[in-house]
Amino acid sequence: LLNGELRNPENKSQRALYDAMKEIKLRIDTIENKLDFLKAIEKLEVMEFVEDSEGDAIRIFQTVNDRGKALSNTEKIKSLLIYFSNKYLQKKYDDKINDAFSNIFELYDDIKQAGENLNITLFKNKEFNEDNIMRYHFIAYFNDNYDPTPSYILKHLKDVLTEFRTSQAYDKIEKFISNYIQTLESFFTSLKKILSRANTNEKYFKIFSILQLSATLYPLTVKLETLDKLDENYKI
């Protein structure tokens, strides 16, 4: 980008950078005295706050979030898990949680783009985001609510972890966090695989693109994929 090479973006983050760069170039072109503008930019000061601990950094980020956009429930869940790992598990899972969610956000971008390319109404909806997939995962792996809101999921996870903390069952906190991030990442991966298959498999294309599989069936369908039971011969 800095060399003026605007290559075709491959994911959501790259598309955002691409669009921002185009907008910046457009605005700069309208400035009459570019030298004065450059001198003004050089006077700007950037305040840097360095925090070596990944867990502490995320806790600070959630507390002083000022990016102009509210945190999604998925981001809040990530922060919650890192908080419990950081404070009660000697930071054992901080990096694992961070890596898992980094992958999850990338998988979501791929899922969203694939769904739109396949003309699936569910994924084309502007309101659809990673929180929707978090709901599907919750329905597939928890038994206490089959129509949870994103805020309900966050509260449920917080209640479970708080209960373990109160009883000082730190081994249960570790087991819960480990299982949750493993199944969550696997769930996002499986959904991406299903949509990728719809590009090459006629039956999957018909089910997802033409017939538009009901949103209520996604939790079951994706879980079957994670269990390797949703092969080409399986009848949905």
Placement of each model-derived feature along the sequence:
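Polyanionic (Asp/Glu-rich) segments that form extended negatively charged tracts
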Residues: 4-236
